[in-house]
Amino acid sequence: MKRGSKRESGGPLTEEPEPLFSEENRSLQDGNPLDESDSEESQYSGLEDSGTDSSDDEEDHSSEEVQDPGKSPKEIIKVPHRTSKSQADSPADEEDQPNEIKEYENDSSDEEDIRNTVGNIPMEWYKDLPHIGYDLDGRKIFKPLRSKDQLEEFLDKMENPDYWRTVHDKKTGQDIKLTDEQVDLVERLQKGQFGDLNYDPYQPAIDFFTHETMIHPVTNRPADKRSFIPSLIEKEKVSKLVHAIKMGWIQPRKPRDDAPTYYDLWAKEDPNAILGRHKMHVPAPKLPLPGHEQSYNPPPEYLMSEEERLAWEQQDPEDRKLPFLPQRFNCLRAVPGYARFIHERFERCLDLYLCPRQRKMRVNVDPEDLIPKLPKPRDLQPFPTIQSMIYKGHKDLVRCISVSPSGQWLVSGSDDCSVRFWEVSTGRCMKSVVLEGAVKSISWNPNPVLVLVAACVDRSVVLINPGLGDRLLCSATDQHISGYQPPEEEVQQPVTWEEAEGSEYSSGLRLWIKHQKEVKQVTFHARGDYFAVVLPDNGNSQVLIHQLSRRRSQNPFRKNKGQVQKVLFHPTRPFFFVATQRYVRVYNLLKQELTKKLLTNCKWVSSIAVHPAGDNLICGSYDSKLAWFDMDLSTKPYKVLRHHKKALRAVSFHKSYPLFASGSDDASVIVCHGMVYNDLLQNPLIVPVKVLRGHAIHRDLGVLDVMFHPTQPWVFSSGADGTIRLFT
């Protein structure tokens, strides 16, 4: 213990005994007087000098210990060495003295401000008073004046760069500017971090008991004797419990009754009665929804005129169609309160408990029953399933094909400027005719008496006699063409008819029909005397009909609505189908009028085909849709098939079997079963049965044309890969 510590605290002197005759004590015995500043008052006054410190006394070895002659050697008086007033005031010694310690230098309180002498008291006590407390002398400490209005507060907020770090101290009533360390502390606390920047919460843990076997034990204290000797206190407790059980003072616990506190009131009720009550429940009919006449701004036709209003007022309330007069208001906030609200609520209550209710039996329909039951494809045979033959010979795209009425011969036109005739059964190319340009369309005359093929080449339509089959039919065809007698008066026609001569005639060419524009399509009438051509142009002469026997041409339309894509003759009736980009128009050629306009719901029609019965039509489009039209049913598609992934190029019906096919740029031919019934009340049955693949995609083109065999369930397809394929 340091010297002088007990002296400062005012306790008794308990220093170690020192020799009586030390140098300092010897000076007292010799009669040497003490220092003037060491008076008796300073020794035993019991007061501490605020100007001195115990630490100075410990470091200063000039302090003296005085032994009272009347005391024992253990009671030693410690007398600190003091300087005189004159010595303390001298400027020479002022530099040697330590600096005067400030009042709050060693103050460790961080909750109270140095300027706040009020203390740590609730400031709510002085909330309504002009002062915030009292100082040490008992005088009031008035609150600082805060005369800033909102404008000055706003200007201070805009101009003072330290406004964001200024806070109001409730204890002193002043604004305090936070230091950087305090701002950093606030930010860390807001983020949920520790206030001390140097504190590391993730210090490496020191596991005292490690996995390593220690040589010496952690604690080597011998076990207590009580750890292996039975406890006498527990023995006494057990004996008391045994005695109490024998005497019957302690009873065993009764088993808890698991019966539920709350029970079901209707547990024993007859279930049939419950079901009957539920079955008899008839829900109340719902209120009808308000109509346009109940709007605050109804349409003009719902507002009554003056005559209608007078007639409504004269009618009895039971005879009125509306129980109110429709009114119009400019805005919703101008609508007044509804005067008939309570009356309508009362009538609704009367209806709920007075009116009898009727039960409507609800029919539960299985959703799967609504789906039509389609037959299996194997029950719909025959239809083509496998690829039987490939006709090779063309060097470019095979754009069009056509089959003879007998089904023995096949003709194809290609971009290599050639027309080839094939034998269907053997795949042999019987004849090849080279023309001036690419063949866009080709059609075999459906009349079995005439052996004639029409092909579109650039701006011309050429009629070819292939000379295949019966020679009598071939010669009769030539006589039919050469026996033409021109009329006496020449009629101006939109085309020019020219006969082939020389080498062209020997190769099979018979007639040239030259047009003013490029020809896109040619198609024959069922009788074989008329054929129509399509000129893809925006003019009025997009469609022309030619008559072979009289060599006459005419434009059936004065004006074409839209760009014509395909045309087709009805197989039995005088109807003419004209397909534009989005519509299919049906014209009656005898009456010269528009009969129907079919809405395809497609972006661009590419091809059409008519059912042999003539009442149904299929339409293919470039947006991968195939639409089936039942013309007796509606002008909209009966069914739209989206089986192909790319644009459809051609569609075709079989003449005798219930089959139709479609060819697409995805190099596939899809064959579907399309049964049309004689019963007008029964819808057609459409079932996809087979996807035929074999063509290769060339220049983003796949199958370009599809044609059925006239008598067999076979289908021909021509593709961009230069081949013709037969599927049987």
From Swiss-Prot:
Record has Translocase as a keyword: no
CC terms in the record's Gene Ontology section: nucleoplasm; PeBoW complex; preribosome, large subunit precursor
Biased composition (Acidic residues): 50-67
Keyword annotations of the record: Nucleus, Repeat, Ribosome biogenesis, rRNA processing, WD repeat
BP GO terms, sorted: maturation of 5.8S rRNA from tricistronic rRNA transcript (SSU-rRNA, 5.8S rRNA, LSU-rRNA); maturation of LSU-rRNA from tricistronic rRNA transcript (SSU-rRNA, 5.8S rRNA, LSU-rRNA); regulation of cell cycle
Region (Disordered): 1-114
Source domain of life: Eukaryota
Compartment(s) of residence: Nucleus, Nucleolus; Nucleus, Nucleoplasm
Entry GO MF terms: ribonucleoprotein complex binding
WD repeats: 393-432, 434-474, 514-556, 559-597, 600-639, 643-682, 698-728
Biological function: Component of the PeBoW complex, which is required for maturation of 28S and 5.8S ribosomal RNAs and formation of the 60S ribosome.
Family under the similarity heading: Belongs to the WD repeat BOP1/ERB1 family.
Subunit architecture: Component of the PeBoW complex, composed of bop1, pes1 and wdr12. The complex is held together by bop1, which interacts with pes1 via its N-terminal domain and with wdr12 via a high-affinity interaction between the seven-bladed beta-propeller domains of the 2 proteins. The PeBoW complex associates with the 66S pre-ribosome.
Protein's name according to its UniProt entry: Ribosome biogenesis protein bop1-B
Source lineage: Eukaryota, Metazoa, Chordata, Craniata, Vertebrata
Gene: bop1-b
